[in-house]
Amino acid sequence: MKAFRIAILVLVLLMAVSLVNSAYLTRRCDEWTTRLNAVTDAAGSGDWDTARQTVAALDNDWQAKQSYLHMTLQHEEINTADTLLQQCVLFVDIQDIDSLFDAALQLSLQWDHLAEMEQLSIKNVL
């Protein structure tokens, strides 16, 4: 009976950690998307200096979270998001608004996908 209780406790702890991870990652992805929207808003209004500063801060924050992300997510998914973010940085540097909007949209969708992958759902369990 004691072994059964330990197994149940371990299962409950794993589920709790999974829920905390999901909530954290969802919050981070939402924050990154909000900051990315600020980049595209600034670029759209012609304020490239603000766009450059905002995307640089976003990139620094993204890079600071890489260790955690690599422990909790699939590497190819992180690499896709990283590539898209670097494209956004480049497009801000060369002031290519159309390409920036395209890359930002893809990156926003990728961050939504990353958050969705960690949510506790039947789709993710099966």
How would you name each of these model-derived features?
Residues 1-41, 52-126:
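C-terminal-biased regions
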